[in-house]
Regions:
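A membrane-periplasm/extracellular boundary helix in multi-pass inner-membrane enzymes
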Residues: 3-6, 23-62, 72-80, 88
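Transmembrane alpha-helices of multi-pass inner-membrane enzymes
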Residues: 32-36, 148, 154, 158-168, ...
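Long extracytoplasmic/lumenal interhelical loops at the membrane interface
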Residues: 57-72, 76, 80, 84-121, ...
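Helix-loop-helix junctions and helix-breaking kinks within/between transmembrane helices
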Residues: 1-23, 27, 121-125
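Structural signal for the C-terminal ends of transmembrane alpha-helices
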Residues: 20-28, 43-47, 137-145, 187-197
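Hydrophobic transmembrane alpha-helices and their immediate junctions
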Residues: 19, 121-162
Length: 207
């Protein structure tokens, strides 16, 4: 209910991706139920929520049009600062963004996690983020083979997937709480990987 009342379409999509990924990994049969519930949702959700959902992807929606304008400006900034970025923090973004602003569309960040990371840290920063995500997904899929931790691994992977999908539409790390959640995902995944490794080493010693 709290998530619905945020009226954040990006957050709703992130949740949908998380649920789908978890079901796909652990309970594929639930996908049919999820689709049925999604089709029935318009019967129960209030019109104001349905209007928000219907506006996803609409270029006539002012919020969508605004984001696209910001993204175009951000891409132009990346073209000029692709190697080093503009510097850490929103103040660095704001200082440089003024020179690339389109049609007076002011912004305090790029409204996209990946564009913002690339703008602040350059190509090395965005590649580092993508590498961490790749490693996290690899470890999660590896731990899916373990009966002890497969559900936890699937939950972590689903959480990361939803987090990153939401990041396509907003700079989700603007909130310290959300940044903390992301690093908690990675920390839990590292703990699972270490646990699997120690169990494997212990098993080899016994044999």
């Amino acid at each position: 209910l709290c998530l619905v009342l945020t009226f954040s379409r990006g957050a709703w999509l992130g949740l949908a991706v998380s649920v789908f990924v978890f079901a796909l990994l652990k309970e594929p049969r639930l996908i049919v139920l999820i689709v049925i519930l999604a089709l029935l949702a318009p019967m129960f959700l209030p019109p104001v929520v349905m209007n928000r959902i219907a506006s996803i992807g609409s270029l006539e929606d002012s919020s969508n049009a605004y984001r696209i304008t910001i993204w175009i400006a951000a891409l132009r900034m990346i073209k000029d600062y692709w190697l080093t970025g503009v510097g850490l923090g929103l103040s660095a973004f704001a200082r440089v963004y003024r020179e690339y602003m389109i049609a007076g569309a002011s912004a305090i960040h790029a409204h996209n996690l990946y564009l913002e990371i690339c703008l602040e840290l350059g190509v090395v920063g965005i590649l580092s983020l993508l590498w961490m995500v790749f490693r996290a997904f690899s470890e999660a899929l590896s731990n899916m083979k373990s009966d002890k931790s497969s559900y936890l691994a699937a939950g972590i992977l689903a959480g990361i997937a939803g987090h990153l999908f939401h990041g396509l539409f907003d700079y989700v790390w603007y909130s310290p709480r959300i940044v903390m959640a992301f690093w908690m995902y990675l920390g839990l995944m590292s703990a699972l990987a270490w646990g699997s490794y120690t169990e494997k080493v212990a098993g080899e010693k016994l044999t």
